[in-house]
């Protein structure tokens, strides 16, 4: 995580460190020093410190209980595939997940909670912004159009789309803490009036029928109990002829549910991201068509660039250098010393294992977080 922090400000330096044998030692010094000196008051900042992870959506003293409930929410099918025990708790599970992880994501990854290609000569942050800005092109946006960001998180994709198109973007997220973060970032970006976050369930949206000119979702609808649940709501609030573009987390044609290693990999991705399950790319296509959309484009963007570094290149480097193991040790130590909430290390262990399995899923080409679907509501 120390290298993630540095990467936000000096990605070139981090890439150099990752080719140097002393990277782990330097990371240790930076991380442990940062833990000690970062005990700041719980105020809103553009980028949370490590210790402010504890002051996100869960009170310090409640973390152990919340983490235990989170893990207990899952069971397994006869094939060993992970599923949520009670479908009625899927929405609250996603809310709990983002209570626990929002600060961590912002600290270690950035305010765009998604993956992207890394094109030659482009930094990580620039690649993320390029990935977000493509949505404006996919949707054929024009200034003043009313656009819906489905599952907006803390709002970086929505702000990017608004900034590069002049459209007015409304984002919806289930999580109250993410609304606070989104409002802060939007004010700092000077985009008040162009991006507005709204708290709500994207499977039961508080918007009028036919009220949006376009809609998009970026790595978010994977949290829906069923894709039809969220797709039908998007269909309802779109005007006739409007476009809906979404990046879906799906299994590819190479996934084999009878392969124990494939199942283990997917289970870790599900648990480590608060998902109900992982659908196939074909199921995602059919879900859109089932609610009335016309399917215009279906493309795995993870495989479309012959020169870009893969979406999993950042966690892959960290796995190759053993940095996730180092991170786990730092978090366990900080938790033991009560610099982080007791038992919080258990959740970070889940995340570290998930990151390693994201890399495997990408390397084995059984999973993609970048399957692009573009739908159109009939006129």
From Swiss-Prot:
User: What's a single GO CC term here?
Assistant: endoplasmic reticulum
Localization per record: Microsome membrane
Transmembrane ranges, per UniProt, are: 17-37
One matching Pfam family, short form?
Answer: Methyltransf_11
Q: Which GO terms describe its biological process?
A: methylation; steroid biosynthetic process
The way this protein sits in the membrane is described as: Single-pass membrane protein
> What's the protein here called?
Botryococcene C-methyltransferase
Q: Which CDD domains match?
A: AdoMet_MTases
A GO MF term: S-adenosylmethionine-dependent methyltransferase activity
Reactions accelerated catalytically: C30 botryococcene + 2 S-adenosyl-L-methionine = 3,20-dimethyl-1,2,21,22-tetradehydro-2,3,20,21-tetrahydrobotryococcene + 2 S-adenosyl-L-homocysteine + 2 H(+)
Assigned keywords, A-Z:
Endoplasmic reticulum, Lipid biosynthesis, Lipid metabolism, Membrane, Methyltransferase, Microsome, S-adenosyl-L-methionine, Transferase, Transmembrane, Transmembrane helix
Keyword Lipid biosynthesis tagged: yes
Entry similarity comment: Belongs to the class I-like SAM-binding methyltransferase superfamily. Erg6/SMT family.
């Amino acid at each position: 995580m120390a290298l993630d922090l540095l990467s936000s400000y000096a990605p070139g330096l981090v890439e150099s460190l990752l080719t140097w044998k002393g990277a782990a030692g330097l990371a240790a010094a930076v991380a442990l020093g940062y833990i000690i000196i970062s005990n700041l008051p719980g105020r809103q900042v553009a980028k949370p410190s490590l210790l402010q992870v504890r002051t996100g959506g869960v009170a310090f003293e409640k973390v152990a209980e919340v983490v235990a409930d989170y893990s207990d929410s899952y069971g397994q099918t006869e094939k060993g595939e992970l599923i949520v025990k009670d479908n009625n708790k899927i929405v609250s599970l996603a809310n709990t997940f983002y209570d626990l992880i929002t600060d961590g994501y912002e600290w270690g990854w950035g305010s765009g909670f998604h993956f992207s290609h890394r094109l030659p000569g482009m930094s990580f942050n620039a690649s993320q912004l390029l990935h977000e800005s493509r949505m404006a092109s996919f949707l054929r946006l024009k200034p003043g159009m009313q656009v819906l960001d489905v599952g907006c998180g803390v709002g970086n994709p929505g702000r990017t789309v608004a900034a590069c198109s002049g459209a007015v973007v409304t984002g919806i997220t289930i999580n109250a803490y993410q609304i606070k973060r989104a409002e802060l970032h939007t004010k700092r970006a000077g985009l008040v009036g162009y991006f507005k976050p709204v708290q709500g369930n994207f499977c039961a949206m508080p918007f009028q029928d036919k009220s949006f000119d376009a809609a998009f979702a970026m790595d978010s609808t994977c949290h829906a109990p069923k894709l039809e649940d969220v797709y039908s709501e998007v269909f309802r609030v779109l005007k006739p002829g409007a476009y809906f573009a979404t990046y879906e987390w799906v299994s590819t044609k190479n996934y084999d549910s009878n392969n124990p290693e494939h199942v283990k990999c997917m289970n870790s991705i599900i648990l480590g991201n608060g998902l109900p399950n992982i659908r196939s790319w074909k199921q995602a296509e059919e879900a859109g068509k089932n609610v009335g959309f016309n399917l215009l484009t279906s493309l795995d963007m993870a495989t479309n660039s012959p020169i870009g570094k893969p979406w999993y290149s950042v966690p892959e480097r960290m796995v190759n250098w053993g940095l996730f193991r180092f991170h786990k040790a730092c978090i366990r130590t900080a938790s033991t010393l009560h610099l982080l909430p007791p038992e919080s290390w258990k959740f970070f262990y889940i995340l570290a294992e998930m990151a390693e399995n994201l890399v495997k899923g990408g390397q084995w080409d059984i999973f993609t977080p970048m399957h692009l679907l573009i739908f159109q509501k009939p006129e």
